C-alpha cells in the first residue's frame, strides 16, 4: 500500500506540462485558469445583458450583491479615481474564487476523465501552482509601479526609494535597500500566501482520498465524514483567500497612489 499510496499522491501532484525545467509550461494550469476566466465573463455578461429593473432573478441578485460589495470595499480603501480599480478588484475576486473552487471537485474525477482522452497527468487547481500565483502577483506588482509613477512621477518615485524612511543623503543606500525589499515582499507574499493555502488544501483532499485505498474498513469509512467536513471548511478557505488577494491588491494600489509626501 505504501508504494501505491506514494504513486497515487505523486500522480495527483504532477502537472500536464510542455518543456523541461524553468521553461516548462503547465498546460493544465493555463487551461483551467482560462476556463475560470471565461466562466466569469460569460456569467457576468449574461446577467448584465438580461438585467431587469423589475424583480431580479437569484443570479442577478447574487451578482449585484457581489458588485456592490466590491465597489464598497474599493470606495473605502482606494483614495483616488476608482473607475479602473473597482472592475479590477471584482475580476480578481471572482477569478481567484472560481479557480479555488475547482478544488471542491472530487480529486479523481477530472484526472480520470482526462485519462479517457490519453492525458495521464492533470492538476486542475490553477492557484495550487506557484507559477500561476506568481504570474498574478507580478501583474499586481506592475500596477503598483504604474500607479506610483502616475501619482508621484518618476522624481517622486526616486525620492520615495532613496529618502524614506531616513530623510538624509547619507542613508540613500540603506533607504533604497529597505524600500526595495518592502516593494518586492508585496508580490512575493501575495503569491506564496495563495499558493500555500491552496496547495495545502489540495494535498489534504488527496490524503483523505488515500484513506479509501486502505485495507481497513474502519479507515475507509472514516474518510467519508472527514471528506465532508474538510469540503465544508474549504469553502471558507477558498472564499477567504480570494478576498485576501483582492483586498491586499486594493490596499497596495491605494498606497502606491497616495500623493502624500513621506
Swiss-Prot record:
Its membrane topology is listed as: Multi-pass membrane protein
What is the protein's given name? ATP synthase subunit a
Q: Which UniProt keywords apply?
A: ATP synthesis, Cell inner membrane, Cell membrane, CF(0), Hydrogen ion transport, Ion transport, Membrane, Transmembrane, Transmembrane helix, Transport
SUBUNIT field? F-type ATPases have 2 components, CF(1) - the catalytic core - and CF(0) - the membrane proton channel. CF(1) has five subunits: alpha(3), beta(3), gamma(1), delta(1), epsilon(1). CF(0) has three main subunits: a(1), b(2) and c(9-12). The alpha and beta chains form an alternating ring which encloses part of the gamma chain. CF(1) is attached to CF(0) by a central stalk formed by the gamma and epsilon chains, while a peripheral stalk is formed by the delta and b chains.
Give the gene name: atpB
Q: Which residues cross the membrane?
A: 24-44, 85-105, 129-149, 194-214, 228-248
User: PANTHER family attached here?
Assistant: ATP SYNTHASE SUBUNIT A, CHLOROPLASTIC
Which HAMAP family does the annotation name?
Answer: ATP_synth_a_bact
Amino acid at each position: 500500500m505504501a508504494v501505491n499510496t506514494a504513486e497515487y499522491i505523486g500522480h495527483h501532484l504532477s502537472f500536464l506540462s510542455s518543456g523541461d525545467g524553468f521553461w516548462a509550461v503547465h498546460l493544465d494550469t493555463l487551461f483551467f485558469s482560462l476556463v475560470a476566466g471565461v466562466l466569469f465573463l460569460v456569467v457576468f455578461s449574461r446577467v448584465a445583458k438580461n438585467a431587469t429593473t423589475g424583480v431580479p432573478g437569484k443570479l442577478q441578485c447574487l451578482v449585484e450583491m457581489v458588485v456592490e460589495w466590491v465597489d464598497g470595499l474599493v470606495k473605502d480603501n482606494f483614495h483616488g479615481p476608482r473607475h479602473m480599480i473597482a472592475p479590477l478588484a471584482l475580476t480578481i475576486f471572482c477569478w481567484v474564487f472560481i479557480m479555488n473552487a475547482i478544488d471542491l471537485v472530487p480529486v479523481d474525477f477530472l484526472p480520470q476523465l482526462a485519462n479517457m482522452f490519453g492525458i495521464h497527468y492533470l492538476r486542475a487547481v490553477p492557484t495550487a501552482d506557484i507559477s500561476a500565483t506568481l504570474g498574478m502577483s507580478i501583474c499586481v506588482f506592475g500596477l503598483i509601479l504604474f500607479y506610483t509613477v502616475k501619482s508621484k512621477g518618476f522624481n517622486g518615485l526616486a525620492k520615495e526609494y532613496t529618502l524614506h524612511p531616513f530623510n538624509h543623503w547619507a542613508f540613500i543606500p540603506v533607504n533604497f535597500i529597505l524600500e526595495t525589499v518592502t516593494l518586492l515582499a508585496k508580490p512575493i507574499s501575495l503569491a506564496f500566501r495563495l499558493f500555500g493555502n491552496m496547495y495545502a488544501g489540495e494535498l489534504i483532499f488527496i490524503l483523505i482520498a488515500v484513506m479509501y485505498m486502505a485495507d481497513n474498513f474502519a479507515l475507509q469509512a472514516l474518510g467519508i465524514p472527514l471528506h465532508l467536513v474538510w469540503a465544508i471548511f474549504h469553502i471558507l478557505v477558498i472564499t477567504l483567500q480570494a478576498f485576501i488577494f483582492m483586498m491586499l491588491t486594493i490596499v497596495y494600489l491605494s498606497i502606491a497612489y497616495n500623493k502624500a509626501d513621506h
